[in-house]
UniProtKB/Swiss-Prot annotation:
Protein name: Growth/differentiation factor 8
Subunit-level organization: Homodimer; disulfide-linked. Interacts with WFIKKN2, leading to inhibit its activity. Interacts with FSTL3.
Site (Cleavage): 98-99
Propeptide residues, chain positions: 24-266
Mod. after translation: Synthesized as large precursor molecule that undergoes proteolytic cleavage to generate an N-terminal propeptide and a disulfide linked C-terminal dimer, which is the biologically active molecule. The circulating form consists of a latent complex of the C-terminal dimer and other proteins, including its propeptide, which maintain the C-terminal dimer in a latent, inactive state. Ligand activation requires additional cleavage of the prodomain by a tolloid-like metalloproteinase.
Alphabetical UniProt keywords: Cleavage on pair of basic residues, Cytokine, Disulfide bond, Glycoprotein, Growth factor, Heparin-binding, Secreted, Signal
Name of the gene: MSTN
Function of the protein: Acts specifically as a negative regulator of skeletal muscle growth.
Name of one Pfam family that matches: TGF_beta
């Protein structure tokens, strides 16, 4: 009897000791599972973020039709950037992106960049050198962006050096042509008279839309132009070949082309932040920093909000194509699960140098994730 009592006491003691330990182990195991799930979600989001950044690099080069990033140094950019009103306005009033989260439309989107403004700098031409020992300027090569779009505006910008006394300046733009019988090599394009006062130099724009359209129709007629801006004493004030201290004052062409609007349809999605515990498909913030890439050839924006999609796509949460849920129910083994992907993308405006050192201002489609969904 005494042995039985001792055994019972030992058994009860073991229950008292072992019981709480067992409960604590279950609690710790459950907590570890929850932490592991959260860590896996964070890791998954980090992987999606990294993949999105790499995809953006590839997309930008592809949509700009560049095989590699242009190799232009910061010093070269400072020399090439025109110090002209239209370019300063583009930079100063630059709309980094259009990200209206309240608008739930899904935009149809072309793949390649839709150019709005192209700034073309003059290049060297053997034809001009043949006409005179020191060509006065200028020969312009036109990219396919100009050739394959409707030109709505074209302006030649020239910089006139400052004057010490009030004077009248006679500006003349001449087009180089094939030699005529009398030896004539030029024909007039535009001429104008300006009154200048002492002070700083000025930028002057001249409409050359008609000439540009003719050049595009007949490329062989584009032999170059000459710029003259003579004051009352016969001094040429036009900066055609910048001297030291005149960097960024080269003549250039500003060409605007059309942009065709697209139709749209409706869609919806979830928005989250990096601290969110949402497990479903959601849009997360992501800032792309071009300076961190070493992409100095992008003038603006230096950074923009691209966003990315991440999260689970259970069929209960399916948003974009409800019929997929029915397909899965009919054949669960033969249908793949939905993925968390962008359902609404919007463009960004970009000012950049292309591979030919031309300055392009254009709209790049599909660079900002506005909505995410399961599809």
């Amino acid at each position: 009897m005494q042995k039985l009592q001792i055994f019972v006491y030992i058994y009860l003691f073991m229950l008292l000791v072992a019981g709480p330990v067992d409960l604590n182990e279950n609690s710790e195991q459950k907590e570890n599972v929850e932490k592991k799930g959260l860590c896996n979600a964070c890791l998954w989001r980090q992987n999606n973020k990294s993949s999105r950044l790499e995809a953006i690099k590839i997309q930008i080069l592809s949509k700009l039709r560049l095989e590699t990033a242009p190799n232009i140094s910061k010093d070269a950019i400072r020399q090439l950037l025109p110090k002209a009103p239209p370019l300063r306005e583009l930079i100063d009033q630059y709309d980094v992106q259009r990200d209206d989260s309240s608008d739930g439309s899904l935009e149809d989107d072309d793949y390649h960049v839709t150019t709005e403004t192209v700034i073309t700098m003059p290049t060297e031409s053997d034809l001009l050198a043949e006409v005179q020992e020191k060509p006065k300027c200028c020969f312009f090569k036109f990219s396919s962006k100009i050739q394959h779009n409707k030109v709505v505006k074209a302006q030649l910008w020239i910089y006139l050096r400052p004057v010490k006394t009030p004077t009248t300046v006679f500006v003349q733009i001449l087009r180089l042509i094939k030699p005529m019988k009398d030896g004539t090599r030029y024909t007039g394009i535009r001429s104008l008279k300006l009154d200048m006062n002492p002070g700083t130099g000025i930028w002057q724009s001249i409409d050359v839309k008609t000439v540009l359209q003719n050049w595009l129709k007949q490329p062989e007629s584009n032999l170059g132009i000459e710029i003259k801006a003579l004051d009352e004493n016969g001094h040429d004030l036009a900066v055609t070949f910048p001297e030291p201290g005149e960097e960024g004052l080269n003549p250039f062409l500003e060409v605007k082309v059309t942009d065709t609007p697209k139709r749209s349809r409706r869609d919806f999605g979830l928005d989250c932040d990096e601290h969110s515990t949402e497990s479903r498909c959601c849009r997360y913030p992501l800032t792309v920093d071009f300076e961190a890439f070493g992409w100095d050839w992008i003038i603006a924006p230096k950074r923009y909000k691209a966003n990315y999609c991440s999260g689970e796509c259970e069929f209960l949460f399916l948003q974009k194509y409800p019929h997929t849920h029915l397909v899965h129910q009919a054949n669960p083994k033969g249908s793949a699960g939905p993925c968390c992907t962008p359902t609404k993308m919007s463009p960004i405006n970009m000012l950049y140098f292309n591979g030919k050192e031309q300055i392009i201002y254009g709209k790049i489609p599909g660079m900002v994730v506005d909505r995410c969904g399961c599809s």
